[in-house]
A protein has these predicted regions:
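Catalytic and substrate-binding clefts that recognize carbohydrates or anionic sugar/phosphate headgroups
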Residues: 1-196, 202-209, 216-221
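Aromatic-lined carbohydrate-binding/catalytic grooves of carbohydrate-active enzymes
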Residues: 192-282
């Protein structure tokens, strides 16, 4: 079901001892005994730390970033419970959002007991090891391993990664607008939305041909402008012991949606787009 319970038992956690510093024209190499080498490169606005792991026994890594009490932090991907991350820790692990966002509520407890499907405040389909600070910098950890970003301490943020990351990147700016520009320069910018999305509502429908297009007709009958419909079960559904799921073969279901290509052409003639689960648009 895409729901995980992750626990850990740390046998040993020890601070790295700096044993050598090698400085060149544009980098500083920090050698920590025979465990890790950190290559630091900084310019006016950007600092990168590239790590070279020398001992493969290291499978956990903690990194602290100085903080202040008034600072706020945002990000860590799509976080749906709290905008400001301070005061909480956020595991970075892809999962279903789950039922409920609070383990103290009855609905979440019941979902956990019966189906292990209860959600928590940090459960998200899209976590990301990146955050933005009101001190006008962003930090990104280049790693795909499980991580936990802890913002509970007033004087530092502690980032835990279940491997030695390839790189930690910190970039700052004088304004939030400039910071956003630098973030999107690194990660990539989303393209502008097409003009047609502003033509009306984009409604979510499912349940077969009659119900889905029937809801569209009812909406149009009330003189509501519609730009498109999003239909996740266009490929059919399967009923399992843990609920309804899609067929996942990404072919239109000829029983639930007979003559779907024809229906799509009909609504296209009205200026309405059709989206499927994979965000293909007709």
């Amino acid at each position: 079901r895409g729901n995980f319970k992750i626990t850990d038992y740390v046998t040993e956690r020890f601070p790295l001892k700096l044993t050598d510093v090698i400085q060149t024209a544009d980098t500083v190499r920090l050698c920590f005994e025979s465990y890790i080498i950190a290559k630091i490169k900084c310019d006016e606005n950007l600092c990168t730390i590239d790590f070279e792991q020398k001992d493969d026994r290291i499978n956990r890594f903690w990194f602290r970033v100085a903080a202040d009490k008034e600072e706020k932090c945002y990000g860590c991907g799509e976080q749906m419970s709290y905008f400001n991350l301070r005061g909480r820790n956020f595991p970075i692990w892809t999962s279903e959002p789950g039922v409920g966002r609070d383990k103290t509520t009855y609905v979440t407890w019941r979902s956990d007991v019966e189906n292990k499907a209860g959600g928590d405040y940090y459960n998200t389909n899209y976590p990301q090891p990146t955050f933005v600070s009101t001190n006008k910098y962003y930090l990104h950890v280049d790693s795909t391993a499980y991580a936990d970003f802890d913002f509970r301490n007033d004087s530092f943020h502690e980032l835990q990664i279940w491997e030695v990351p390839k790189q930690i990147r910190i970039e700052c700016a004088d304004t939030y607008l400039k910071l956003l520009e630098r973030i999107t320069t690194y990660f990539g910018r989303q393209p502008k939305l097409p003009d047609w999305v502003y033509n009306g509502l984009i409604i979510g429908v499912q349940g077969g041909n009659e119900r889905s297009f029937g809801l569209l007709d009812k909406t149009l009958d009330r003189n509501i402008k519609v730009a498109g419909i999003w239909c996740q079960d266009w490929c059919g559904k399967r009923v399992t012991s843990f609920g309804k799921r899609l067929q996942w073969d990404w072919k239109y279901h000829k029983e639930m949606y007979p003559d779907l290509p024809k229906k799509i052409k009909e609504i296209n003639a009205k200026g309405i787009k059709f989206w499927d689960m994979l965000i293909h648009i007709w």
